[in-house]
Regions:
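Conserved active-site tyrosine of GNAT-family acetyltransferases
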Residues: 19, 40-43, 186-191, 195
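Conserved acetyl-CoA-binding loop-helix of GNAT-fold acetyltransferases
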Residues: 143-148, 152-168, 187-192
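Acyl-donor-binding surface of acyltransferase catalytic domains
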Residues: 1-68, 202-206
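A conserved beta-strand-loop-helix scaffold within acyl/acetyltransferase catalytic domains
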Residues: 93-146
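Short amphipathic alpha-helix that is part of the acyltransferase structural core
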Residues: 63-96
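A short, internal acetyl-CoA/4′-phosphopantetheine-binding micro-motif in the GNAT/acyltransferase core
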Residues: 7-11, 144-152, 180
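Conserved GNAT acetyl-CoA-binding A-motif
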Residues: 26-34, 167-179
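Short glycine/proline-centered loop/turn elements that form peptide/ligand docking sites
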Residues: 160, 182-186, 207
Length: 207
């Protein structure tokens, strides 16, 4: 895909960030179709359908909510992030070695690995990973998670807004994707942080 095509409408052009669009091969037996694709209705009878949203932040206004007293930001390593992701998402895993491979991405930036730590217990209670494609100035939110007992307390918004702040002046826009029907309502979180222009992409796997 050409840069100009992607930049004209990043959410509709691809379900993936630009750098992945041109480097990732869709596995055999899988299709990724946009919500307006006329093939969707027919294929839904023969394929398992998982819808994902893709949103964009125009980076014009970024909130900067303060951390509550007793909490601090820290830079986590892949082991800490792997353990936290596993604790937040029982059905998903990201091994330490898999996360370590992110350091090889052309979009890797160590300043965009972030965690919130409870200063009393030293426990990580929220974390996130973002990346930056300096070629087209696209920021990408890869992982954002909050420990179950700390949800609905604003920590997810703090993580997202802090990552956006660190991307400010370096990224012209930031994209994020997630499961549309996830019970933790990630789309609502991102929209509350200023993301917009949602497009649904359907990941279809042959049954």
């Amino acid at each position: 895909m050409k840069k100009e095509t992607y930049l004209a409408d990043p959410c509709r052009a691809s379900s993936l960030p630009f750098w992945k669009t041109n480097s990732v091969t869709v596995p055999e037996g899988m299709l990724i179709l946009r919500e307006d694709d006329p093939r969707l209705e027919e294929l839904s009878h023969t394929h398992a359908d998982t819808p994902y949203f893709k949103l964009i932040h125009p980076m014009q206004r970024i909130a900067r909510p303060a951390l509550p007293v007793g909490y601090c930001f820290k830079t986590p390593n892949e082991k800490i992030l792997s353990e936290h992701i596993g604790a937040c998402y029982p059905s998903e895993r990201a091994s330490a070695s898999e996360l370590a491979s992110y350091r090889l991405h052309p979009t890797y930036d160590p300043d965009l690995w972030l965690a919130i730590q409870d200063m009393e217990t030293n426990a990580v209670i929220a974390s996130g990973i973002a990346e930056l494609d300096t070629d087209i100035r696209e920021g990408i939110l890869e992982w954002v998670q909050v420990s179950p007992v700390y949800r609905r307390q604003g920590f997810g918004r703090i993580i997202v807004c802090e990552l956006l702040s660190r991307l400010h002046g370096r990224a012209d826009f930031v994209t994020v994707s997630g499961k549309e029907n996830d019970p933790s309502s990630p789309r609502s979180l991102y929209e509350n942080c200023g993301f917009e222009s949602g497009v649904i992409w359907h990941v279809l796997k042959k049954e």
